[in-house]
Structures are given as structure tokens and as C-alpha cells.
Regions:
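Internal, conserved structured core segments that host functional sites
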Residues: 91, 95-139
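Acidic, serine/threonine-rich low-complexity disordered tracts
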Residues: 15-105, 149-269
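Long, charge-rich C-terminal accessory regions
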Residues: 137, 141, 147-149
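C-terminal segment of classical bacterial N-terminal signal peptides
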Residues: 4-14
Length: 269
């Protein structure tokens, strides 16, 4: 009887729409392959998880055999994704870069970043206030659209996301540009909403750095958002940004998402 009761409780808690995304991406610069990666996102009624991995390839692998992993998890609170932990590791032939962030209610409670930023006098310091009301970089890539209409809509682009990546605090702003239709080699075929992206550094950066100035002045970066089935969450299908070497593109070759109905989850308990 206890097992039946637990199953019934779990089923009732899982009644809201839920879904899973399995995506694979190819990265290119000026049309030249430089890397590939995978991303798995699971959206539950009260929580979410996301994990990613990637590696360089082609000409880029000749210069650096970099590979990386990342993971984020959190809660669904008031219809929004609120992260509780984030971890990322990037390893190349010479270095290991690691970031760990713990959060509660949108506020950073603990974090480590190795190697640490150089304590340059011109660097704008990150304050305690800068680490409040933020999300991690992976969570920032997911967009939850409120309401009851089609989530693949201009509304998905109307947002400004405060991000802390363990070293730098910045805002990611977006605006609606247009609607498009896409077809993955495997998985999703249908409409996407195209958003212009804007980068605004807040702290942890050196204002005179050329890379920072380039990102601040950039006006041609865009992301194409596609739906995760069974949810009101959208994820990137395509991302493009001009670089000094040519157009940088991250494009999904696989974008397979499926709703996970409550009765299916109850059956597995």
C-alpha cells in the first residue's frame, strides 16, 4: 500500500507538462568546422537539469585539443528556471579551467573559478550585489515563455538576463527580429523565433580590452529558439555571431525533444 501511495503522490506531482531535449551541434567559423557538442535538457514540473559536452575538431584541433563539459540544475519557481548549481570544465593541451557556482533563490552562495582572474587595477571588481539575482551561463540559454499561447513567439525575445559565470557579471539582452522555419537532420522541423542578442558587461572585466569592446559594439549576433516538446521552454537551435575571422555559427544537426507525460513517469516509479 505504501508503494501505491508513493506512486500516486509522485504522479500527482508530475502532472504538469514535462519534456526532454537531446541536441547535437556543429560549430563553424567562416564555414570551416571547428567543433561539435551535445546538450541534454530535462524539464520537470518543479525542477530542471541541463548537461553539455563538446570538443574541437578540424583545423582548430590542430592548434588546441580542447574539450569541455558543463552542467546546471535548479528549480521551476513561479514559472521561471532558477538555478541552484552550475559546474563547467574546459581542458586543453596546456590548461584546465574549472568553475563551480552554488545559488539559492537567484543569489550566489558560493563559487570557485580556477585559474582566478589576474588582480589588475583596471579591472572592475565584482561586488556582492553583482552576485544577487543572477543565473549561470547554461541556464541563461534556456527561455521559459509565460502565458498559454504559442511559446514560439516574439515574446520569447523580450528579456534581459543577468548572468554570472564565476568571473564576470554581465547582462544578455535580446529583441525580436523575425520568424523562420528550420529542419534538423534529425528531430525538429517547424518554426523558430529569431532574437537579436546584446552583451552588456557589468563587472569582472577590463574596459579597455579589445574583446570586450567588440562584444559591446556587436549588433549582428542572433539566436534562433525552438521549443522543447511538452514544455513552454525554448532552447537554441542556431546561433551566429560575426568574428574577425568570419561568421561564427553553432547549428543543431539533431534537435530531438519529447514530452514526458505524467502517466509515463508514474509507471516507472
Amino acid at each position: 500500500m505504501a508503494a501505491i501511495a508513493v506512486t500516486a503522490i509522485d504522479a500527482s506531482h508530475s502532472a504538469a507538462a514535462q519534456g526532454r531535449l537531446d541536441a547535437e551541434y556543429d560549430a563553424t567559423v567562416a564555414g570551416i568546422p571547428i567543433g561539435h557538442g551535445s546538450w541534454v535538457v530535462e524539464i520537470f514540473d518543479n525542477s530542471f537539469t541541463a548537461s553539455a559536452s563538446g570538443t574541437t575538431e578540424g583545423l582548430m584541433k590542430f592548434f588546441t585539443g580542447a574539450r569541455g563539459t558543463g552542467a546546471s540544475r535548479g528549480t521551476m519557481t513561479a514559472g521561471q528556471l532558477v538555478p541552484t548549481s552550475y559546474a563547467a570544465t574546459i581542458i586543453d593541451d596546456r590548461h584546465i579551467d574549472e568553475v563551480h557556482i552554488s545559488l539559492a533563490g537567484g543569489n550566489v552562495t558560493d563559487y570557485t573559478a580556477e585559474p582566478a582572474l589576474l588582480p589588475l587595477p583596471e579591472r572592475i571588481p565584482v561586488t556582492d550585489a553583482d552576485r544577487r539575482g543572477v543565473v549561470d551561463p547554461m541556464t541563461s540559454a534556456l527561455t521559459r515563455v509565460g502565458g498559454s499561447g504559442d511559446p514560439v513567439s516574439p515574446e520569447a525575445c523580450q528579456r534581459k538576463v543577468p548572468v554570472f559565470d564565476g568571473r564576470v557579471r554581465y547582462d544578455l539582452g535580446s529583441e525580436f527580429k523575425r520568424m523562420e522555419s528550420v529542419k534538423a537532420e534529425k528531430g525538429y522541423e517547424g518554426p523558430v523565433v529569431v532574437c537579436a542578442l546584446y552583451f552588456t558587461p557589468i563587472s569582472g572585466y577590463v574596459p579597455d580590452r579589445a574583446a570586450i569592446k567588440y562584444l559591446v559594439e556587436l549588433r549582428d549576433a542572433e539566436v534562433w529558439l525552438a521549443p522543447i516538446a511538452g514544455t513552454r521552454v525554448l532552447a537554441p537551435f542556431y546561433f551566429s555571431m560575426p568574428t574577425p575571422l568570419g561568421l561564427g555559427v553553432l547549428k543543431a544537426k539533431q534537435f530531438v525533444s519529447a514530452a514526458q507525460p505524467a502517466h509515463a513517469i508514474a509507471k516507472t516509479q
